[in-house]
Amino acid sequence: MKTNAKFDRKEISKIYKNIARHHIDSFDFAMSTCLNRACEHMLPFDYIVPEESASCGFKKLTLWYDSFELGQPSLGEIDYDSHILYPSECRQRKMTYTIPLFATIFKKFDDEMVDNFKVKLGDIPTMGRKKFCNLKGLTKKELAKRGEDMLEFGGYFIVNGNEKVIRMLIVPKRNFPIAFKRSKFLERGKDFTDYGVQMRCVRDDFTAQTITLTYLSDGSVSLRLIYQKQEFLIPIILILKALKNCTDRQIYERIVKGNFNQRQISDRVEAILAVGKDLNIYDSDQSKALIGSRFRIVLAGITSETSDIDAGDLFLSKHICIHTDSYEAKFDTLILMIDKLYASVANEVELDNLDSVAMQDVLLGGHLYLQILSEKLFDCLHINLRARLNKELKRHNFDPMKFRDVLTNQKINCGIGLIGKRMENFLATGNLISRTNLDLMQTSGFCIIGDKLNNIRFLSHFRSIHRGQYFAEQKTTSVRKLLPESWGFICPVHTPDGAPCGLLNHISMSCVPIGSEEKQIDIDKFRNILGELGMNSISSDLCLNYHTGYYPVIFDGIHLGYVEKDIGESFVEGLRYLKCTQSQPDYAIPRTLEIAFIPFSGYSRNLQWPGIFLASTPARFTRPVKNLHYNCIEWISPLEQMNLSIACTDEDITPETTHQELDPINILSIVASVGVFAEYNQSPRNMYQCQMAKQTMGTPYHNHQFRTDNKIYRLLFPHRPIVKTRTQVDFDIEEYPSGTNAVVAVISYTGYDLEDAMIINKSSYERGFGHGVVYKSYTHDLNESNSQSTRGIKSSVRYKFLNNVSQKDKSKIKLENIDPDGLPKIGSQLTKGKPELCIFDTLKRGAKLSKFKDSEKARIETVRVCGNDDKNPDNLSIGYTIRYSRIPVIGDKFSSRHGQKGVLSVLWPQVDMPFTENGITPDLIINPHAFPSRMTMGMLIQSMAAKSGSLRGEFKTVETFQRYDDNDIVGHFGKELLDKGFNYHGNELMYSGIFGTPLKADIFIGVVYYQRLRHMVSDKSQARGTGPIDILTHQPVKGRKKGGGIRFGEMERDSLLAHGAAYCLNDRLFRSSDYSEGFVCQNCGSILSCYVNRAIMKTQTFIPPSLDESNKDTEDKEIHMNEKVICKVCKKNSNCKKVALPFVLRFLANELASMGIKLKFTVNDF
């Protein structure tokens, strides 16, 4: 394995070291190449002036996009008073990091000459660090000069000052026929079955359209597609006849492929042809006309001048097998799907697993961004502009001459400026507002905030991949299972426990989703290369067919030809040789070409549909392995991996082995591989560590003075771990430490260490162990105050930051923490109610103070004054960061790197701590019972290794699955300890800190890297006596900031019931919650119909108690005697009884009464 490790580091570490490479490549490729491809596929906008409208000098207007152009981020107009915009400025000013988008638009009036003009469509958000970012190509020093982290890798958008990441989603494999069963198909009609074959067809501009062939009980096939969120079912014969002029016999022979003896297939094909006979279609034009007549109502780009045949052509080219432009290729693809459907129905092949990675692709952020942008650009012309033109024609002051200057008139141009805002809204909310839904199964949850709690959490956002929000709502667990096909592509360890388990995964360390095309393949040249290797090209002559003993060759969803069964392996091996060696002089085959060979099983039933499947498109999972035949690195995909023999180690190599893993650790994600000696731990503990590593206080960044994150945790005195993994070095994780090396003794001491609690040495605590801070940033914009001005005053200089409080107010308010300019003083302390900002109102000539509302003490860390885009010096915004001290207190959580989580139970004086013969007292004590049930042997090994490293004065760089002499890792580090005069097993004689006598047992003591988690008592402590209550239920409101109550849930209730604490239960859930008194009618049992009638007799003299206290008892008694409780239903007052009841019960009775449901109560005396 040593040779493999060197081979790995030398050859490919640079390739996948960039954590967010797939995000950046996808965006750059989408914007630089595919945006103009989308432009070519967009239909022109044809506008025919209605006859009843006023004459405007023309009858028909045609507009279309010719090309798009993107600029660089800047402020101000191009070539006029502009300056370069950098991400750091956008963060501090809470702006969006955008680039200008320009379009060249052609227009034509009737038969006049074509004219063109260039227009700015708006500013769209851009991704940081690469092609469309001003940080591209900057060195570490230049990055630091621009206010960025020296190790900044980009891959995110900046929207309103926040870093947003478009998360990766799993989608069905593109341009590949997938056979499956779905019970929902049965609901479409009486003849429908649950068998289907679907293909997610994706065009070169990433536009997707899924078509599904469904098997009917009579043997025929129906094609299903969704267009603008509507489902359409079309007989397959109608599509086949429209794509190609052919006879029924030719279609019959192409599907049957010489198997005339199989009566079952023949009957099914005859059923397909019978549907065509019923529809009276015999040639291509008839089929197109029928399709066009049915779909012209819903198709975009159809005018009254468009014929049914042209509408049918438009439907076929834009919605059927859109990954290819040729009708011939579309026809062959549908025939191929019918073949697989019939084979699945006949049980000749197994159904495909939609949850397998082999049947999946990844939807990258840049590709999704392009799909949304393309749709918005299309809607701008075809929907927004059409509505605007219709509105202009109906204006009473319509001017025909101005109307010709279409798209140059700002009134007509208004729809275009919304493109940037819509893209910004998508990134800010993660919600997809789409006319077509982009062939996706969800409309929300696409974007997440790239929060920098620590560096590990931040980088994991770029490696996470989600199964889809649709599956999170399902009760089935099959989508969550870890399948063998995921080996090397999806990390088996790094997934959260709880609701998202198995749905939110992380790609492995070596997995690289392809974000861009390595090279665009010339299909004709590639067909010739395959022909030289032995492929027979598919013929346009439908009479020439190949029987089922041939392998079909499919390239990116296009059926190219067939290969004989006997030469299938040699054909694939020859193609793999050209891929690995790049020895083709005329035409180089992409290194990431997928060569998936599924051979015949040799039995009557195949596990998979046999064929040779080639793919070169982006958005595929790939990873590098070592090809043993050619001694080079080969990039493979999940479908390709299933039929390869890949050895993990040197000992696994057999004569049949073709490939070998570069490093066994490559199956783990970056976060999972950071854990040291993880292979010696119980598996769930490694899962817990992946989550806790992302909840640790540490060093989130190095450009602290330029960051304005809403909330940031920071450890004041972090250490580099003495024992670290090679992954931490390769990915620069060690530059952002998130823990402390602590001397840990495993001993039961004082009794405060039960149930995972831990004892911290008080002197270590005083030296700064675990000390941290929390930063919160706030922004105050004068524009917001200006917009709230009364009486329509819009003066931009009404409000100023100025400490101009009157002498009368100064005597009442302490302003020592506010500077003369009205801004907070850096370093000043803030307490609740203390002024933190002073704004002067120039209109009312008075000062307005903004007061600190938090109950916890804090200090001003930084203050930033930012200008506005209107270049008005008085139109400012102020940003300031507040620092909260977070020293460890009892109840705060700590954890090791092995999933051992515990809370601080007590700070124990150093004089009472146990000590070794060398006089070393531990920083931390944990109970020995933490290990047997958790089986985290890796933590014990780490303790020995770090102890050895500290004695030898060196860092220990280890790696998961690393081999040691005689496979004895304890012996390896034990000998190092023995050489330094310490015990072989890491035990030492310790003395009692209280009595000074030796302890009877040797104590295991060493050095462990401990992490402080963000779950702190200071953030969660909550208590109240009385406080705000809910208006409807009269129960205490929830929320710590609102002064709400503590949640008393079902488990708490059950515990009191089990203890029989009835009075305590009554006090907590009734008297201290929503206690109320009311009346219940004993006759009808209603608590809603009773009311109190206080009738004062005419002979009674009412004396207020406040005027005559001596008559208070008499007066109260008189009023009480005159109260009458009457039931409105029964009209009686003798049967109403006063009871104590929860107010929420009264609320429930009212709600049920509104639905016609009556609650009846019975009153008994106990």
UniProtKB/Swiss-Prot annotation:
Q: What are the alphabetically sorted keywords of the record?
A: DNA-directed RNA polymerase, Metal-binding, Nucleotidyltransferase, Nucleus, Transcription, Transferase, Zinc, Zinc-finger
* A molecular function GO annotation: zinc ion binding
Tell me, what is an example of a GO biological process annotation in this record? DNA-templated transcription
User: Where are zinc fingers of the kind C4-type found along the chain?
Assistant: 1081-1130
**Coiled-coil stretches noted in the UniProt entry, renumbered to this chain:** none
User: What EC number(s) has UniProt assigned to this enzyme?
Assistant: 2.7.7.6
What this protein catalyses is: RNA(n) + a ribonucleoside 5'-triphosphate = RNA(n+1) + diphosphate
Which InterPro entries does this entry report, sorted A to Z?
Answer: DNA-dir_RNA_pol_su2, DNA-dir_RNAP_su2_dom, DNA-dir_RNAP_su2_hyb_sf, RNA_pol_bsu_CS, RNA_pol_bsu_protrusion, RNA_pol_Rpb2_2, RNA_pol_Rpb2_2_sf, RNA_pol_Rpb2_3
Record's Gene Ontology CC terms? DNA-directed RNA polymerase complex; mitochondrion; nucleolus; plastid
Query: Where is it located?
Result: Nucleus, Nucleolus
Indicate the enzyme's highest-level EC class.
transferase
**PANTHER family in alphabetical order:** DNA-DIRECTED RNA POLYMERASE I SUBUNIT 2
Assembly and binders: Component of the RNA polymerase I (Pol I) complex consisting of at least 13 subunits.
Query: What is this protein's function?
Result: DNA-dependent RNA polymerase catalyzes the transcription of DNA into RNA using the four ribonucleoside triphosphates as substrates. Second largest core component of RNA polymerase I which synthesizes ribosomal RNA precursors. Proposed to contribute to the polymerase catalytic activity and forms the polymerase active center together with the largest subunit. Pol I is composed of mobile elements and RPA2 is part of the core element with the central large cleft and probably a clamp element that moves to open and close the cleft.
- Spell out the family assignment given in the record's similarity comment: Belongs to the RNA polymerase beta chain family.
Name of the featured protein: DNA-directed RNA polymerase I subunit RPA2
The gene is RPA2
